[in-house]
Amino acid sequence: MPAFRLPVRQLVEFLLRTGSIDSRFTGFDRANEGARIHRKLQKAAGEGYAAEVFLSGEREAAGIPFTIEGRADGIFTDEAGVTVIDEIKTTAVPADDIAEDMNPCHWAQGMVYGAICAQQRELETLDVRLTYYQIDTDEIIRYTRHFSAAELDAFLNDLLRQYLPWARRQLDWVEARDRSLGALQFPFPAYRPGQRALAG
């Protein structure tokens, strides 16, 4: 069975996102503005800060192989020698209202990247840092949490267990589609020159 490919953000938001009419984290022009601010903060972080780090990890849940992947905003090693996953978020929420537990998806995203990074680098511990950039005042608010690799691993495995019903549905649909396509007959008595090669 081929691996079920799952972007980190999709996994986290599918399971943990809650409804809200608060659009201060998203918006029409926010994506471009957010990307510009990400680059600004990443550049200011200095030497030793790796920006936009692609991470991909293999996991299995109930016999289904998963490939979980995405780009961590930043990874660096702090003064104490601890690897830190930096998750950057731009927001219009007033700085006084930017709380550590404001959005569980933000921590979850960093923790999933942390689980993959810890596995790849064989780390026993790792920090996840949320960097909030307030777009109206240019204020930067940071929160950091320390995790063991075992905690991060258990967190990711739990998310995958929760996601299993949807993964199974999608895999069943793909299997049914492929069976149906395999049973289709070519609607004409013969292929035209080159048509068979094009059809595969």
Please state what every model-predicted region is.
Residues P2-S20, T125-Y132, R168-D178:
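Short, compositionally biased low-complexity segments
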Residues D172-G200:
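Conserved pre-motif I regulatory segment
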Residues A150-G182:
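Polybasic (Lys/Arg-rich)
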Residues R36, C105-A108, F147-D158, A190-A197:
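Generic recognition of stable, solvent-exposed alpha-helical segments in well-folded globular domains
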Residues E58-D153:
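Mg2+/Mn2+-dependent nuclease catalytic core
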Residues F25, D29, I98-C105, A190:
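Conserved aromatic-histidine-acidic binding/catalytic patches
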Residues M1-V82:
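Metal-dependent nuclease catalytic cores that hydrolyze phosphodiester bonds in DNA/RNA
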